[in-house]
Amino acid sequence: MGTNRPRPRTKDFFAAPALSLTLAGVFGRKNGPAASGGDGVEEGDEEVQAAGEAAVEISSENAGPGCRQSQSGGGSGEDGGHDDDDGEGSNKKRRRKNYHRHTAEQIRIMEALFKESPHPDERQRQQVSKQLGLSARQVKFWFQNRRTQIKAVQERHENSLLKSELEKLQDEHRAMRELAKKPSRCLNCGVVATSSDAAAAATAADTREQRLRLEKAKLKAEVCMPPPRSRARPFRCATLQDTDSGELAMLNLFQIERLRGTPGKSAADGIASPPCSASAGAMQTNSRSPPLHDHDGGFLRHDDDKPRILELATRALDELVGMCSSGEPVWVRGVETGRDILNYDEYVRLFRRDHGGSGDQMAGWTVEASRECGLVYLDTMHLVHTFMDVDKWKDLFPTMISKAATLEMISNREDDGRDGVLQLMYAELQTLTPMVPTRELYFARYCKKLAAERWAIVDVSFDESETGVHASSAVRCWKNPSGCLIEEQNNGRCKMTWVEHTRCRRCTVAPLYRAVTASGVAFGARRWVAALQLQCERMVFAVATNVPTRDSTGVSTLAGRRSVLKLAHRMTSSLCRTTGGSCDMAWRRAPKGGSGGGGDDDIWLTSRENAGDDPGEPQGLIACAAASTWLPVNPTALLDLLRDESRRPEWDVMLPGKSVQSRVNLAKGKDRTNCVTAYAARPEEEEERGGKWVLQDVCTNPCESTIAYAAIDAAALQPVIAGHDSSGVHLLPCGFISVMPDGLESKPAVITASRRGGEASGAGSLVTVAFQVPASPSAAAATLSPDSVEAVTVLVSSTLRNIRKALGCDSCEEEF
């Protein structure tokens, strides 16, 4: 180690055996010869590896393209001979740097640390250098080179996937161009259409469109003209119940389909009204549909409505900021729950309007107010863009939002910024059970940047008396200024302060869920924040490159992780849309008794059809059944049972008595309970299953947990694990779509378990079990057959019976 050593040359590190890596060495390597060596061996280095020589440490300072490794046993020494500068016996010889080989034990220890922390800090590097007898620079460059090689391998794999996708798109493009060159044919008879026929058809279409526009303008003038005795009464827009089939043809069909939430279906005499939730006899108030508006894509009645809505949103923003930053006496900490409780008298004194909050205290209405704070692992701008995009917002809260739409953009920006954007929206909120009616909301959403790293998103329902907007009597829920403040924190996190303040019309709720809905847990701020934290962790883990091996078994590539997590998210979202009490799902009680009876549990039935619009589900008529019940068990104990691989044969009717083992396990959050798992029968029983696996997605937060699973062919899942697109994989999910505390702290639990930190307490659990089965391969089938009804109800009742038996509470009775 002389002081006059010249600067070394740069070595080609891709040829070094120590850095010939594969993803299996990072994610799935087991203890063995390969693990002890630490790296894969390239073709030209097999003899060196077989001789037991350790890999060479390569760094940015001791590498050169022309260097070769010394074969000296001591692991140190000069590499090759000396190069003479003058060739005439000069005494100045260029001395090459000594290269030190790492022993197998050194590589093993550094690999173990790399799996836990690919980016060690200075303290960790110093500790490793002292432990292994290496310099801190050697440790630093070893980790740097390892990360570089892993990134290169991942990029090559992703590039190959992108290349194959590009070739596929090019083939489709060529096929479409060839098809466009062919002459057009009539869709009805198949005859080639001539240019004269096409011109005549276009002329007829234009004439018909002009006639419809004239009739529409006439009807619009008649509807908007109030009678002489009611000029002071507010305008009520027409709904489907007020319009006959002849007038329906004059309405904006796109607006009807968008607001009603129907998947583009129409009846013979007009637009078909979607079935409404009938999950309880007194829940018929849920049958009201979103109002229809006969403006060309517009929602406002007058041009001067926009300034009034902007003024309303500005006032709501000021109130939201005050509600988020206020302490006592506006918000009082609850003694039993520890959550913030709104002091309504103080709220009216500080914030509320000229009428003193009388609108919130109308007969037949209840007021719910809650506030929650939490840290979210996502940057501020990503959250802001997600909240202002209705599709992304709905996908972010699959357990809470069943339908959502943007009605009209009031204020927008030409660039991609979101500061000052104001839009009118519609949403239908749900609890994951058919026994609780959904909540329909029409509101204005306003996004405003308050400071450099501080944003506010406020929702407020619009009042026709102040804005002139088409407010409908069908709206059953009203948003007082609600929303969230987002403040940027360090390490890519942000602080979320959420306020949920609504008033709803009183409606009959099943006794099972009265405590949950009355306390505000079902639709409160705490549930919104918990769901947001869960989904943000899922998105972060989907793109993370430093996931420990124990949290990513069975999948060796980043693209594979993304594909599997995307498939699991689609499975859970599909089951959430099916199980809620939305107007689109006409739930009815299943007949009790017989082989399909559910015992004392009420089983709800409905059906839906897939005419080929969703490639991720089987086509035809699908029978759906769900049952909600109370179990005298802590939610943690119930969740532990459902996740226990060894106890799954006790309750899973899809694997009756079959022992299973986990083939894939991907964590998607800090809590390893949130994971995606693929189960398969053990090798001695796998032949009986015919290559069927069970894909399961577990999502848990302090407010509720969901467990969605579905049978899937192993041959269909393997390409997804390899990183290919999962949109075409057929899944028909089922599962325990909702496990939440019952809200009755005074009721003693029969079975208890140690709770995780921060989990909601409760004496028992409210559980909703849902199953789906194909009823008919044809979507034209109108009703479910008795065999389909019996099959799906037996699955639900058998699963509940098995769960009670496994928990030892099959003899317990509900006490509500």
From Swiss-Prot:
Its main location: nucleus. Residues 302-541 form the START domain. It holds the Pfam family Homeodomain. InterPro entries: GLABRA2/ANL2/PDF2/ATML1-like, HD, Homeobox_CS, Homeodomain-like_sf, START-like_dom_sf, START_lipid-bd_dom. One of its GO terms (biological process) is negative regulation of trichoblast fate specification. Residues 92-101 have a biased composition (Basic residues). It is found in: Nucleus. One of its GO terms (cellular component) is nucleus. GO terms for molecular function: DNA-binding transcription factor activity, RNA polymerase II-specific; lipid binding; transcription cis-regulatory region binding. Keywords: Coiled coil, DNA-binding, Homeobox, Nucleus, Transcription, Transcription regulation. SUPFAM superfamilies: Bet v1-like, Homeodomain-like. Residues 95-154 bind DNA. This is Homeobox-leucine zipper protein ROC9. The gene is ROC9.
